[in-house]
Amino acid sequence: HANGDGGIEIVTQAYERLQQLHPRPNARHLVIHCQYPSYSQLQRLKAAGAYPCFFISPLCHWGEIHAGYVGADRVARFCPCHDADELGLPYNLHTDAPITPVDPLIQVCTAVTRTSRKGTVYGPDQAVTVMSALKAVTIHAAFLNFEEHVKGSLTPGKYADMVLLAENPLTVAPEHIKDIAVLRTYVGGDVVYSRS
């Protein structure tokens, strides 16, 4: 777990050193939260085979509070998903539940719009496409947990954990993504929740 650039620097140095002393291909070391990494830290994490797990939900819930503590300029780099995409560095989006609600659509919406609940936009240059954000809560999340062979996409032989949404997040207005209703949830192909 590392939030600020100082903590992320310590973790990055540790991963670099570990890979020098005990090289491990495909280690998939993680930096949980990873809220304020610099571009160069993301480059170094990639080189060390490490990945960010962005805790982006606070930007939606408490963007103004973060800006009050560290300034709007720094909040503009909060969970820089676009930089990670540009580097070809897979990442996931997580909620740190119960800190923020377990609602991947809020995470997707926040990564795409970079907008707080009060309507403030922070770091629009770090916004990503809807598809990129969806990958962060599906196939990339599975990959970072060494579960891409059983989760993260709908492929024969995988668990068939999925949701049926009332609307297509790829076609609705980006700010509406967080409001899309979940009609059904499937685990292992079985319905475990139905909105009916």
Which stretches of residues belong to each language-model region?
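His/Asp/Glu-enriched, well-ordered alpha-helical/loop segment
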Residues: 6-29, 33, 39, 43, ...
